């Protein structure tokens, strides 16, 4: 028998769920739909703009999604993590440009050689097509928007975490800070990015990307003279991006970074 309390609870839970969906949709709609085309290659991306103040420049965050959000709908890349940057509180406290590109099916943000299971990834000489397009897009955005080029940040989860390392090593003078989440990369090239303030996140129980990838990268960065931050969640598997991007200390740290 369903009592009145149960009915009220169900109604309340439905109301909360609907409110959350409406709130998420409202935040998603803040991101403009965009398409970057260069020499016949296309990169879909969404972009969030700060409230305009023509007297100042703003930081820019590049957000790289994971492999599950690949496609061409220009929507899936907003499912995980990036919406934390779009909250009213964060946008008010840290007004910035947020760029969320979408990687096409069967492509990657990174271009590595090696055996994934043995944690011996090696950076190839040329970037992947999606990464090349991101950098070309960024050049256009800097030309046409009030972007502070001393405060360009990059972050990503899983495949996007690997893409974050890839970008840092290929374009080490571009970024003011980086936040790779449950990612993997070429530890032999850690010295190239040792000067970039970096905060790494990983779940200790991650079955998809071995957390030892992060341990290895931290060790290599320290050996190269860096002082990376590291947060490991002891009871978390692959979904470490949920607590990582909800971390207000990380947000405060990220937006404080500026190239010297």
Language-model regions, residue ranges each:
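Gly/Ser-rich "nucleophile elbow"/oxyanion-hole loop immediately N-terminal to the catalytic nucleophile
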Residues: 52-56, 111-157
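C-terminal catalytic histidine-bearing segment of alpha/beta-hydrolase fold enzymes
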Residues: 181, 188, 197-260
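Primarily recognizes the serine-hydrolase "nucleophile elbow" in alpha/beta-hydrolase
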Residues: 139-192
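Active-site machinery of serine-nucleophile hydrolases
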Residues: 69-131
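The conserved beta1-alpha1 loop
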Residues: 64-65, 202
């Amino acid at each position: 028998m369903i009592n009145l309390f149960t009915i009220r609870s169900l109604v309340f839970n439905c109301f909360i769920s609907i409110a959350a969906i409406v709130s998420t949709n409202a935040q998603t709609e803040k991101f403009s739909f965009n398409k970057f085309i260069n020499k016949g290659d296309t990169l879909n991306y969404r972009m969030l703009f700060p409230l305009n103040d023509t007297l100042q420049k703003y930081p820019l965050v590049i957000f790289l999604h994971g492999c599950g959000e690949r496609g061409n709908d220009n929507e899936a890349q907003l499912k995980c993590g990036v919406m934390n940057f779009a909250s009213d509180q964060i946008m008010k406290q840290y007004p910035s440009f947020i760029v969320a590109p979408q990687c096409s099916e069967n492509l990657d943000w990174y271009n590595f050689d090696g055996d994934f299971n043995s944690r011996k990834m090696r950076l190839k000489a040329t970037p992947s097509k999606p990464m090349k397009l991101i950098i070309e897009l960024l050049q256009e955005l800097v030309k046409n928007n009030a972007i502070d080029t001393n405060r360009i940040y990059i972050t990503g989860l899983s495949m996007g975490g690997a893409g974050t390392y890839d970008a840092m090593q290929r374009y080490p003078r571009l970024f003011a800070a980086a936040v790779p989440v449950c990612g993997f990369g070429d530890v032999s090239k850690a010295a190239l990015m040792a000067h970039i303030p970096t905060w790494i996140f990983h779940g200790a129980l991650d079955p998809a990307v071995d957390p030892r990838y992060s341990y290895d990268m931290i060790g290599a960065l320290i050996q190269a003279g860096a002082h990376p931050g590291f947060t490991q969640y002891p009871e978390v598997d692959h979904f470490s991006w949920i607590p990582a991007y909800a971390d207000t200390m990380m947000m405060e740290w990220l937006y404080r970074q500026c190239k010297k």
